[in-house]
Amino acid sequence: MCSLPRSRQTGPPIELPHNSTLLWASNLRRTREAGMGLFSRRLVPFEVTICGIDELGLHCEGRVTHVLSILDPGWPEPEALSAFDPHQRLELRFHDVIEAGAGWMAPQQQDVEHLLAFGRDLAGEKEPHLLVHCHAGVSRSTAAATLILTQARPGRPAEEALLTVVRRRPRAWPNLRIIELGDALLGRRGEIVEAARAHYRRVLEREPWLIDQMIEGGRGREVAEAGKLS
């Protein structure tokens, strides 16, 4: 039987969902039941799911073949993963920050190299289904999914990949440091960064109250990229 373990947050506030866990779980169940929980194969050559720790139990019967886990350093392995069918898993450990600082481990180039290699490997599998999760499915996981989708369709605009992620995770706020590292590694010459910048701008124009929260949470550079610093 799948379960929904409770998670704790040790990083900056961006990873916390703005809706309750129960609401997120309820919405996710409805989208899965409607057959809308997976990205269209017109956009990517494999199935992709994005979620937070509290939602992992909803996917243990989803025939997931690959799991990308992005966790805070020292965080225990999510118990819900033990209920999944046998799968390949990559675990990365860093905080949801965009600048290195005392007590915080920022994502490094090697981390992004690993997640991109994981994405390339699964693309060669037969009918792969990738699940990407971080703590809330908001920042680290959406950045990783954006890069993997961009890599999977090199001839398509990076913005298309990001918008696909946003349609699946409307509260997405991709971690800028991960995006910048991936943009450079994929040789996209700022295209993915620009897509993220445009997304930040749309979110902050719609919800300007987030500006102070982002700045207080150490994410002021993302606000600046959106052109919203006063």
Segments the model singles out, each with a brief description of its role:
Residues 18-19, 27:
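Intrinsic-disorder-associated, low-complexity terminal segments enriched in Asp/Asn/His/Tyr and depleted
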Residues 37-83:
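Glycine-rich, flexible N-terminal cofactor/catalytic loop recognition
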Residues 93-130:
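Helix-loop module immediately N-terminal to the HCX5R catalytic loop
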Residues 122-152:
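Catalytic cysteine-centered active loop of the rhodanese-like fold, especially the PTP/DSP P-loop
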Residues 123-127, 150-230:
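PTP/DSP superfamily signal
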